[in-house]
Amino acid sequence: MEKRDELYAGKAKSVYRTDDPQRLILHFRDDTSAFDGKKKESLARKGMVNNKFNAFIMEKLQAAGIPTHFEKLIADDECVVKNLEMIPVECVVRNVAAGGLVRRLGVEEGQTLTPPTFELFLKDDAHGDPMINESLAETFGWATPEQLATMKALTFKVNDVLKQLFLDGGMLLVDYKLEFGLFDGEVMLGDEFSPDGCRLWDANTREKMDKDRFRQGLGGVIEAYEEVGRRIGISF
């Protein structure tokens, strides 16, 4: 497969076209950012760690019957994915109160959420990725009711698989965001799953093992990512 021109550069990944119009290459960079890009840093090994972490998780989800865009690793920091028509709506599940939920509602951080909450956000950096609902998504054409129903069902299926995976490694899957797209009309999981896009706490100590270490200046960001991976069986 031939890597061609850069299609898009995000905050931490670059997307490249290939000689196959239905396939793309994702390049995971060492860049990290927070607070809508106001805090930025380059962290050695991050691209490699997130690429391998994402591949491991995507393969677990595929084995559980969840369709994803992931196809294969081709380098320490690159993988091949299907070229999805992305749906501009993020799905967020929260198992434990943290982050934006605590700020919005004033609830206590660390409270177990039963049942888990499900939220939708519009992918729109210029407006701070605002929270939306199904009605808005349908009215403005961001997603159809059928697509939203499939996205919600898949998001909760991901929760069933990954909550147990991380719990077996002594960790709590606090919350996470997912993005979906269409491939030949089928809704499938896109983007990535890594500690950049979820919250993970040690189940006993509640130590933060995710991107909050960067947001809050706790240090040891990549070491924490690698420890999460080690606990669930990833070899870096």
Swiss-Prot record:
<dbReference type="InterPro" id="IPR001636">
    <property type="entry name" value="SAICAR_synth"/>
</dbReference>
<dbReference type="InterPro" id="IPR050089">
    <property type="entry name" value="SAICAR_synthetase"/>
</dbReference>
<dbReference type="GO" id="GO:0004639">
    <property type="term" value="F:phosphoribosylaminoimidazolesuccinocarboxamide synthase activity"/>
</dbReference>
<dbReference type="InterPro" id="IPR028923">
    <property type="entry name" value="SAICAR_synt/ADE2_N"/>
</dbReference>
<dbReference type="GO" id="GO:0005524">
    <property type="term" value="F:ATP binding"/>
</dbReference>
<dbReference type="InterPro" id="IPR033934">
    <property type="entry name" value="SAICAR_synt_PurC"/>
</dbReference>
<comment type="similarity">
    <text>Belongs to the SAICAR synthetase family.</text>
</comment>
<keyword id="KW-0547">Nucleotide-binding</keyword>
<dbReference type="Pfam" id="PF01259">
    <property type="entry name" value="SAICAR_synt"/>
</dbReference>
<dbReference type="InterPro" id="IPR018236">
    <property type="entry name" value="SAICAR_synthetase_CS"/>
</dbReference>
<dbReference type="GO" id="GO:0006189">
    <property type="term" value="P:'de novo' IMP biosynthetic process"/>
</dbReference>
<keyword id="KW-0436">Ligase</keyword>
<keyword id="KW-0067">ATP-binding</keyword>
<dbReference type="GO" id="GO:0009236">
    <property type="term" value="P:cobalamin biosynthetic process"/>
</dbReference>
<keyword id="KW-0658">Purine biosynthesis</keyword>
<dbReference type="GO" id="GO:0005829">
    <property type="term" value="C:cytosol"/>
</dbReference>
<protein>
    <recommendedName>
        <fullName>Phosphoribosylaminoimidazole-succinocarboxamide synthase</fullName>
        <ecNumber>6.3.2.6</ecNumber>
    </recommendedName>
</protein>
<comment type="pathway">
    <text>Purine metabolism; IMP biosynthesis via de novo pathway; 5-amino-1-(5-phospho-D-ribosyl)imidazole-4-carboxamide from 5-amino-1-(5-phospho-D-ribosyl)imidazole-4-carboxylate: step 1/2.</text>
</comment>
